[in-house]
């Protein structure tokens, strides 16, 4: 399947083989690499210059991967991880702000964001290097984001359990709210203030 896009110098089959060979030997990553572009033939469109585009291939591909891996009776956690990484595998190709990066870390957790980075690095290095720069600082950004998260816990939030009780919250609601506040703070959606 020819990709008809300047970002790719390999056909789809050889691109996938290249990505699979470049990801670390991790089962979730290997399945992700194998299936990440599976929807490209279904969603391919051409612009007026004859250049192919694959909008939504990551969304359609994540659904297809989930169906395939479910039929193979693989563990649910593995299926969910592969589906999530495929769904997000185009996110890191755009300029990702620190806020968005921290939000990804909060949503995915360290292990799966690291897998996403490893996948994207293998994917990028399997493209046309005259058009795509395979160099990035994603590993360093992950390290910085983790260090930031390790420095802040729910106990460091300006709004504490007593404040929430005074607002009328009870029991397990308090822990849930504090966890949500921490996630929002770490993804820079809110400041660490009582207001």
Question: Where are the language model's segments positioned?
Answer:
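Conserved, hydrophobic alpha-helical core segments of structured domains
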Residues: 1-121, 131
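Charged substrate- and nucleic-acid-binding regions of tRNA-handling and nucleotidyl-transfer enzymes
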Residues: 67-71, 126-195
